[in-house]
Design a protein with these regions (language model features):
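N-terminal edge beta-strand
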Residues: 27-45
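Aromatic sugar-binding surface patches on proteins
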Residues: 83-88
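Bacterial N-terminal signal peptides that target proteins for export
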Residues: 2-12
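Short, surface-exposed alpha-helix to beta-strand junction/turn motifs within ectodomains of secreted
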Residues: 49-74
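A glycine-anchored, Pro-Gly-centered beta-turn/N-cap motif
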Residues: 90, 95-101
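Extended, polar beta-sheet/loop recognition surfaces of beta-rich domains
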Residues: 40-44, 48-52, 110-122
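Bacterial N-terminal signal peptides
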Residues: 11-22
Length: 122
């Protein structure tokens, strides 16, 4: 009886460890790096945009847009992905002021993640 209990307990512990280990690979997208960096100042009027994440990103289902100093939302076209964890775009004709880059990305785990990067154009 004790041997059966020990076997069952061992099996359940191994199963639990396997499930926990597989979940480590299913993390939501976390921003690792960006250009421009958060709270930085950049020279305009044209600004290159790059956001890099900790996981693969579906560029076709992800979105980037800017919130301009006047509150207008400016959608950005995402360039063809050179790297599966990176999105790039180009913001043209930006006037001086405070902007927010808003990102909404579909990660490899199937979950949407979002965030914002404030920066200033000189």
């Amino acid at each position: 009886m004790l041997a059966a209990f020990t076997r069952r307990t061992s099996f359940l512990l191994i199963l639990l460890m396997l499930v926990a280990a597989t979940q480590l690979g299913w993390a939501h997208a976390i921003l690792k790096d960006s250009t421009p960096k958060a709270n930085s100042s950049v020279t305009g009027p044209d600004v290159g945009i790059t956001v890099r994440f900790n996981v693969r990103i579906d560029g076709g289902r992800s979105r980037l847009h800017l919130i301009a100093p006047d509150g207008a939302s400016l959608p950005l076209t995402i360039a063809k992905q050179d790297s599966p964890d990176t999105l790039q775009s180009q913001a043209k004709g930006l006037k001086p002021g405070a902007y927010k880059l808003i990102w909404n990305v579909l990660a490899s785990d199937g979950h949407m993640s979002k965030g914002e990067i404030p920066f200033t154009v000189n």
